[in-house]
């Protein structure tokens, strides 16, 4: 497995100036990769980003949430086009995955529980995108997020259900400890219930601040990862910088940490220590 961090730890934007800051920060922290948000995939400077990654010896992964106008249940055609564009960009960047809230615009709520028709649309579109992504060597990670950000998939059990519906080998589960702290009754059981279908996890504190300073039960998290012999990526996620596309949807109204440097220093030290304590971390080459 590899250890990485989300770009929003360093910057809420992605242009070449900000990308250089993000990639340099991740490299200085000794990370294996950086997670690049593809909220506006058509605007990303692919060649410039690739050059920066190569210069600093870093790999990348890619993630996204759908734009408001492409909320999948309401606009499946627009969602499919957007996702396939993001797959193209991820492939050109050299990312092996595209993960996140691939099925919804974060913050779009209907005031009602999800319907069977909505899940049929999600299944149909993500199955099509999975076939497209497979030809480009990309796997899709579906993330469960909390009830205030989506009404569709909040729990590991719901992730399992949608994976059963899509039934494609390059589609997997993506968990996030911040969302789990809100929705799940614990951390160990949801991780173990997904087993090998869990291939990506955001390690995020209960307030999205520095890991180890909040309410997440980290021993249970890493005990669960060890139980399933987790071989996916470990990704520290926080928001030292606010992105204008996500600030409202994620309700981030203030700085969550003193600085990116403090977050990376203290957060990564804590997470690496916990992973080592539970023997839940191995190097990429051990996969």
Show the residue positions of the predicted features:
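Histidine-acidic metal/acid-base catalytic patches
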Residues: 1-7, 11, 16-27, 94-95, ...
């Amino acid at each position: 497995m590899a250890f990485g961090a989300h770009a929003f730890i360093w910057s809420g934007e992605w242009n070449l100036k900000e990308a250089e800051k993000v990639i340099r920060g991740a490299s200085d922290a000794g990370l294996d990769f950086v997670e690049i948000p593809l909220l506006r995939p058509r605007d990303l400077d692919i060649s410039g980003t690739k050059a920066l990654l190569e210069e600093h010896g870093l790999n990348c992964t890619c993630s996204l949430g759908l734009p408001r106008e492409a909320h999948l249940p309401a606009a499946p055609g627009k969602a499919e086009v957007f996702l396939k564009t993001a797959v193209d960009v991820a492939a050109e960047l050299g990312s092996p995955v595209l993960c996140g809230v691939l099925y919804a615009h974060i913050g779009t709520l209907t005031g009602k529980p999800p319907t069977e028709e909505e899940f049929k649309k999600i299944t149909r579109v993500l199955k099509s995108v999975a076939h497209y992504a497979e030809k480009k060597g990309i796997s899709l990670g579906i993330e469960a997020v909390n009830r205030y950000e989506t009404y569709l998939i909040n729990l590991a059990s719901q992730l399992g259900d949608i994976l059963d519906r899509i039934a494609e080998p390059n589609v997997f589960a993506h968990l996030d400890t911040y969302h789990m702290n809100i929705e799940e009754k614990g951390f160990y059981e949801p991780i173990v219930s997904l087993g090998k279908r869990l291939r990506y996890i955001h390690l995020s504190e209960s307030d999205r601040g520095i890991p180890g300073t909040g309410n997440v039960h980290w021993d249970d998290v890493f005990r669960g990862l060890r139980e399933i012999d987790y071989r996916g990526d470990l990704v520290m996620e926080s928001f030292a910088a606010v992105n204008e596309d996500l600030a409202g949807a994620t309700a981030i109204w203030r700085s969550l940490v003193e600085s990116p440097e403090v977050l990376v220093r203290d957060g990564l030290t804590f997470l690496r220590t916990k992973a080592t304590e539970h023997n839940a971390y191995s190097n990429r080459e051990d996969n």
